Amino acid sequence: MQAITLEAVKRETGKSAARRLKNQGYVPAIMYGKDMTENIPLAVEYTKLQKLLQKYGRNVLLNVVVNGTTHTALIKEIQEDTLKGKIIHVDFQRVSMYEEIEATVPLRFEGIGLIESKGGIVQHQLWELTVESLPDKIPQEIVVDLSHLEIGDTLFVKDIPVPEGVKVLDDPEEIVVSILVPKEAGEEEEEEGEGTAEG
């Protein structure tokens, strides 16, 4: 994963400073992590951050440039205004390129349409995996192909292939997806079975 450059500026703290930043088109942020003695309050341009997230997702390796100094970092947390759907704060975690870290990676499911065409219902139990790897090995997403599954099948964490150098920390026996028979069809089969037994 190639690091993407994002410029940031140091900011003042406090509510009035936060309002001023917002009016200027910035979103407050903070950086903490590897070899840092104190957290750095930052601000980044809202539109640039939004475009970056839309293009690369949240699991993007960043070169955060602050006053000419480059910090290798990941986005650790994003706070959003759920009503307005806007980002209100970002946490950057500075990392070492030579030390493994934990990250949460979303799952993208393919083949759902094929299962539904067979009459199956896809029941999701897990939408993301917790992984451990070097920062540049963290995938933006993990693709899960469901097209080979049949009604009644179950997909576990251990069944999901991940890139080389990535270790999954979730329980291998945890269920990710189950393929269910439609409820009505199941009820009809039960009723037919009962009718046969009575006859």
Swiss-Prot record:
Annotated GO CC locations: cytosolic large ribosomal subunit
Ribonucleoprotein listed as a keyword: yes
Domain of life: Bacteria
Transmembrane segments: none
GO molecular function: 5S rRNA binding; structural constituent of ribosome
SUPFAM superfamilies referenced in this protein's UniProt entry, alphabetically: Ribosomal protein L25-like
GO annotation (BP), single: translation
NCBIfam families: bL25_bact_ctc (TIGR00731), PRK05618.4-4 (NF004141)
Family note: Belongs to the bacterial ribosomal protein bL25 family. CTC subfamily.
Function text: This is one of the proteins that binds to the 5S RNA in the ribosome where it forms part of the central protuberance.
Name used for this protein in its record: Large ribosomal subunit protein bL25
UniProt organism field: Caldanaerobacter subterraneus subsp. tengcongensis (strain DSM 15242 / JCM 11007 / NBRC 100824 / MB4) (Thermoanaerobacter tengcongensis)
